[in-house]
Amino acid sequence: MAADHTDVLIVGAGPAGLFAGFYVGMRGLSFRFVDPLPEPGGQLTALYPEKYIYDVAGFPKVYAKDLVKGLVEQVAPFNPVYSLGERAETLEREGDLFKVTTSQGNAYTAKAVIIAAGVGAFEPRRIGAPGEREFEGRGVYYAVKSKAEFQGKRVLIVGGGDSAVDWALNLLDTARRITLIHRRPQFRAHEASVKELMKAHEEGRLEVLTPYELRRVEGDERVRWAVVFHNQTQEELALEVDAVLILAGYITKLGPLANWGLALEKNKIKVDTTMATSIPGVYACGDIVTYPGKLPLIVLGFGEAAIAANHAAAYANPALKVNPGHSSEKAAPGT
């Protein structure tokens, strides 16, 4: 076979994709990752590498970047091929092979395909406040790539979900001052996190303002002020800030995958209990999939990845059984 051929092609190198690759490798098959981001890890790397994750089995807490590091090390003995900075554009059937072409004009073939593309293409949701776009990169942020960026700064966080609440807590030991505003009286974040947030507020370690919204951002070469307002009384407050962290969610798009002929439901790929899509030989796992009872959790993505990988392996090589047996009974990976 040509050098661009592997037994299995995995679209997406986020946590679910990486773990799927591990299991494909455990079954003795070759595999390639195709991902538009410049490095593995998906959103964990691109959006919150220094955010703690608390719901991964066996880890009381783990930095997102450390979880990715472990996944990359886990799959490394199986010699994965990484095609990073390439978006999968088309999927075609050529005889008993699939051909995927990418945004870089490359074509890769495989006997089976696993789609682990996360939420698809994503970009931050802007709230449209005057000065917001003007100061992007000069004090307005939509993600925390490094906590060090906020060292000793007065930070305004805008949002009411898990990211906003988690970062308000996570930056307590870094920022000089934290103010969190949310346009509703109640937060959407996990109950335990909200309880911890309000405790920190009561102790004077950070400020919480509800129901407040961002009216405008002001400054010179960098952000200097943020004007917020109470959305019921319209009362304004001018806050001296060094950084405005807008965590209002992300706009996601399925992108080219929408044209692959897959059965979809609300921009998610429909799968059965084997993680099979509507196209035989194409499987999917992680945040990209939907099925009755689906929850968008990393820990579930790992389970889905194992199911998808083992069924894809058996499809690519019918001599293999779907059940891989126990990993503890096998030789160490790479030996």
Swiss-Prot record:
Xref: InterPro entries: FAD/NAD-bd_sf (IPR036188), FAD/NAD-binding_dom (IPR023753), Fd--NADP_Rdtase_type_2 (IPR022890), Ferredoxin-NADP_redctase_2 (IPR050097)
Cofactor note: Binds 1 FAD per subunit.
Keywords, ordered alphabetically: FAD, Flavoprotein, NADP, Oxidoreductase
Residue positions binding FAD: 35, 43, 48, 88, 122, 287, 328
Uppermost EC category: oxidoreductase
Domain of life: Bacteria
Gene Ontology MF annotations: ferredoxin-NADP+ reductase activity; flavin adenine dinucleotide binding; NADP binding
Reaction(s) catalysed by this chain's protein: 2 reduced [2Fe-2S]-[ferredoxin] + NADP(+) + H(+) = 2 oxidized [2Fe-2S]-[ferredoxin] + NADPH
PANTHER family given in the database record: THIOREDOXIN REDUCTASE 1-RELATED-RELATED
This protein's name: Ferredoxin--NADP reductase
